[in-house]
Amino acid sequence: MKTKDLREKSVEELKALLDEQQLNQFRLRMAKATGQLGKSHEVQVARKTIARIKTLLTEKQGNGQ
């Protein structure tokens, strides 16, 4: 997901998206560990998306200064 798209979301939407992405990352890691994941780069993409969301949450909550 692009940062531009994430910036348009509210704090509540970002928190919900963060929960969803963390669950997705967990599922991807389990699939990778059991050898069922065909596209191993998806784990890295999920991790970077989570980092983007956390960064934007920090900025929007006023702690980024």
From Swiss-Prot:
Which key words tag this protein in UniProt? Ribonucleoprotein, Ribosomal protein
Q: Does the keyword Acyltransferase apply?
A: no
> What domain of life does the native source organism fall in?
Bacteria
**One GO molecular-function annotation for this sequence?**
structural constituent of ribosome
Q: Name one GO cellular component term.
A: cytosolic large ribosomal subunit
Cysteine pairs forming cystine bridges in this chain are none
Annotated Pfam families: Ribosomal_L29 (PF00831)
Instruction: Name its GO BP terms in alphabetical order.
Output: translation
Q: Which family does it belong to?
A: Belongs to the universal ribosomal protein uL29 family.
**Cited NCBIfam families:** L29 (TIGR00012)
Name of the protein this chain belongs to = Large ribosomal subunit protein uL29
Q: Which organism is it from?
A: Acinetobacter baumannii (strain AB0057)
Taxonomic lineage of the native organism? Bacteria, Pseudomonadati, Pseudomonadota, Gammaproteobacteria, Moraxellales
